Amino acid sequence: MTAASHQQCPKCAYVRQEQDTAPEWQCPRCGVAYDKIITAPPADPGAPRKPGASAVARSRGQRFKAFRVTVLLIILIFVGTDTWLTRLRATSWGHPLRVVVYPINGDGSEAAAHYIAKLDVTRFAAIERIVKQQALHYGITLEDPMDIALAKPVNSIPPLPLRDGNMLKTIVWSLRLRLWASKWDGYGGPTPEVRAFTLYYDPKTHPVLEHSTGLEKGMIGVIKLFASDKMTAENNIVMLHELLHTLGATDKYDLRTDQPIYPDGYAEPDLQPRLPQHKAEIMAGRIPLAPNRAEIPDSLADVVIGPKTAHEIGWIK
């Protein structure tokens, strides 16, 4: 084997072989004169191959993804444990459930700003009354099972839930919401078990509102309401529905048709004849009147908390 063997052409990268007849100074393939001699070692089929740049990048990406998932799981375990303990204390009903309302101008309107400016805690008195009345029915004898307080307005819109998010995106949204809530928790009184961020909208420009959200993991409500004195009764129904969601209550209506589901979505499931009903189960949200027909109650006076919901929030063990 001569010294010129295995020389690599700087132009075409051809590695010179012993049998090549071209002059040693010239590439047998492209004919260029060598201006640089590169000694390449003989190819060894059994030698391990170094990974390319793309393989290295993929490996790094996979390690980073695994790291992110691990960190996310650690955060979820920590947050989940804290949430579980908070909910356990809240649903033991050994003391009043502390709820703090944080009003937000949802649409930036003057109507919502004016409504929030004159908002006071008496607007939620009907919620406290119905909870006390229904709790007594299930043997909860606290003087005030639910204690609602009002915080200063919040000048920020919370992260809104994704309509078609997958499980991972929903988890990330939940964590973002809890982080956002911790930044805007400016209430100066006792730490609340439930935080209700109420977004108010001008009913003239928003005659129909999107769904509200009651998050059990974190015990946070993002509740969309009308900035109108005339809509107080309707607002209170929506608000109580979402507050009970934060305590673990589930919906009791068909998500496709909005019709109450029998029997848990009926205020009087044993009534004969079954229809029409006279009141609404709070987590069903409507009074069943006839097959495939139900109406929204006028106020909380037309609402009950059924046995299934009472069990979910800890009133029935």
For the regions a language model picked out, list residue spans one by one.
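Short, intrinsically disordered terminal segments enriched in charged and Pro/Gly residues
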Residues: 39-49
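Propeptide-to-catalytic entry region of secreted or membrane-anchored zinc metalloproteases
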Residues: 59-72, 77-189
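Short Cys/His-rich micro-motifs in 6-15 aa windows
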Residues: 31-40
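Short Cys/His-rich zinc-binding micro-motifs
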Residues: 13-18
